[in-house]
Amino acid sequence: VEQHDDDSRWRLCWARQPSRPYTARSDVLADFPDLAAREAALGIRPGQPFLLMADGRPDIEVLEFFRSAAFQSLAAGSQESYAPDIQLFLSFLSVQGIDWRAATFEHLADYEFWRRRDQHNPDRVGAATFSRDLAAIRKFYDWQQWRGNVAVSPVVLHQPSASGDSDSRRLQPSAVRSVQLKWLTPRAYRRWRDVGLGGYRGDGMRDTTWRGRNDGRNLAFAEALWSSGLRLREGGTLVLGEIPNADSQVRYAKARVGQAVAKGRGRDFWISAAALKSIDNYVISTRAAAVHRARSEGRYDALTDIKVVDTVDHHRRVHFTNREGTKGTVPLDSLAWRDRLNFYITTDRGLEPWMVWLSEAGLPLPYRTWEAIFSAANDRCQNLGVDIHCHPHMLRHSFALRMLVTLIYAHERKMGITPAERREYRHIFGDPWVLVQTLLGHVNVETTRDCYLEPVSGLQVDLFLNDDVAEDTSIADFITHIAAAAPGIVDTEEQ
């Protein structure tokens, strides 16, 4: 099956953000000044995704799914990924003239072949991505079947195969972990950062043609993820009140990430003093300039649905006042990323967004924007002959590997303690895996092991057997030493 043409694809849309200035682009919409109230009455949440047919007409049964409890109870990240997954499957059916209500297991099997193995599809995906596709399609059809809109879901066929499994089970990839994680060594990260985000050339010299207006912001964000291991959504939605003060007496400062942006589980995190200094420099320079421009152009005055923070109490409850002067409170932990876009603070110079990361226009930067920024940095590296690729989550992986190697190295060689003292240390603080689990916020230590066991497999044995690694070797050098034997670790340009 060939790629879908644009005129046959279902359209992925999002409900309006009330905090953003909005001008009706249609005379029809202009006739409904109470549109926001109508949407709220129907349970349509600001920024929520939904689908329209290729010609722009609504399919009520599809729209009902997107405002159902089954969909809206999903984590924000799952909603954002499930919507385009469902869009793609419905488009796959539409281009063949198949109504989604008539989809069968055979159609789903065709889709699996096209998505993963069809040589005519230039955008084939791996096991992990298709597993997510299947989860989204199952969620959609389970709800439609429950509502009586389809008789049988194409994802669930209770007809056992010769092996005893249902047919649909055969579509579930058995090797989801076959997708290779990648990590950057410290020197590879610095090279990617300097060239991709910082305006250097491949030869290490400054690029005189570089016009990076936001390099202060972008460098500070990369340093924040690199030094803290925060997920993209966690780091990309931080508000000013969540950034700890840089303390010259400590190398890492502790802070807390909110529950609603941390996969439903708030947690402590640690961030380096160097990263905090980069953020401070961004706040007083590039960010301050963007805020000044926005104020001068009256951009904040045009916002109608913002909440101005009065204070955050010791219970982490945010006290705020809205545009109408009505006061309210909300737990900081319950603020999802879209909620955070609407919160502002007042300084002696006027209003400004509460979120740390802003666009050039002085408005909060939706965290997914960072994916495009990293992609542009990768393109710049590629064009300048630096064959290092990085995405935001790769910085989290790299942080975890760096911490794990550091802890194992400290336990086995550098602490200078007896075996009995080492056992006592582990009894009090836990082994390196548990400590890294804490740093990453994983619920289960097995998740940590599943992700990071391969690159450090045999590391403890290697530390005892290979005395050629000097005692004064730095952790960065040591990671470079083991990178040679771990194909997933990117140290210099990939060959």
Residue ranges with predicted function:
Residues 148-150, 225-249:
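Short, charged phosphate-coordinating catalytic segments
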Residues 371-438:
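Short, basic (Lys/Arg/His-rich) helix/loop patches that form interaction surfaces
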Residues 237-346:
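Conserved tyrosine-mediated DNA breakage-rejoining catalytic core shared by Y-recombinases
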Residues 167-214, 263, 274-281, 285:
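Long, amphipathic, Lys/Arg-enriched alpha-helical "connector/arm" segment
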Residues 62-78, 86-174, 208-209:
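N-terminal core-binding DNA-recognition domain of tyrosine recombinases/integrases
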Residues 9, 459-495:
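C-terminal secondary-structure termini that scaffold catalytic or DNA-interacting sites
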Residues 250-258, 391, 415-456, 462-466:
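Short functional hotspots where side chains directly engage DNA or cofactors
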Residues 194-232, 427-430:
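Basic, Lys/Arg- and aromatic-enriched nucleic-acid-binding interface segment
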